[in-house]
Amino acid sequence: MRAVNLPGDTSMTADAARQEKLAHYLLRAVNKAAREHRMFSSGDTVLVAVSGGKDSMTLLDLLHRRQRAAKESATLVAARMLPDRACGRAVPVLWLEQYCQERGIPLVTEPFEIAEELAETAASPCFRCAWQRRKALFQTAQRMGCNKLAFGHHADDVAETTLLNLFYTATIRRMEPQVALFQGALAVIRPLAYVEERDIVDYVKAWGLPLEGEPCPEGMDSRRRLMRQVLRLVEQDCPKAKRAIYNAVERNQLTLRDLRSELVECRKQIAALDPCAAAERRQT
């Protein structure tokens, strides 16, 4: 039965309009990233890593929406990795099972061991947990025959990682939207790379996505927290700072690619007395 709004009552239609507007806005960003980095092809089986947090649930929800209208016929599989060590966050899976069942998305729940290893090392528990979680995801993707592994990293994560690499390793590297692994057998993709965290928060609130409790208290190290503070400070004067950081790395990569290409040309003409073709182009 369709709901009937009373005269002057526009709350339901306003909420629905906001939901659809947000979904359309975020899907445009996802489609842009997918198109520019060729993330999806027909016949793909995509393993979506879900923790129950806002980022991974938004990713799963958007990919499911995209699947209904996309040109490529890809299969989605949700994967939830459960550590054997309690780290301060709840790990309920019943609501996630219901969510996936209602949408026809297969859900794989895999435990992985971390407690014994942490007892034998002084390494950061969050680092070791993340390492083992990713290893378990790779193994699950291989077992399930998945050729793509989707993570919920967003534009803020990409910018923060770039700043971390710049300040602490003196390298200009970012969290790439797509990375081929294991000689191309598996590709890690980040469809939310162009989506900002604040838009994810709005999306979750608008659609009422079921979420877990508080995130792991060890989930953000002090350096990343500092980079987040720096980024927010810069954004007060430069609202498009995250995109500027992303584009700066992109231009740097293109420049390096051109230089490598020119070096190949120079080597081909190494015995010639005249300037090589690459040098002539630089002089014009």
Q: Language-model features: where?
A:
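ATP-dependent adenylation/nucleotidyltransferase module used to activate substrates
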Residues: 2-162, 168-171, 198-206, 272-283
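A structural signal for well-ordered alpha-helical scaffolds and beta->alpha junctions
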Residues: 23, 27, 93, 134, ...
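Residues that form generic nucleotide/phosphate-binding pockets
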Residues: 29, 33, 166, 230-233, ...
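Residue-level signal for secondary-structure boundary elements
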Residues: 38, 42, 171, 175, ...
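Catalytic subdomain that performs nucleotidyl-dependent activation
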Residues: 76, 148-149, 156-233
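Residue-level detector of flexible, active-site-proximal loop/helix-junction positions
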Residues: 83-85, 114-116, 179, 195, ...
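Short, basic, helix/turn surface patches
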Residues: 131-144, 178-184, 231, 235-251
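The feature marks non-catalytic terminal segments
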Residues: 209-284
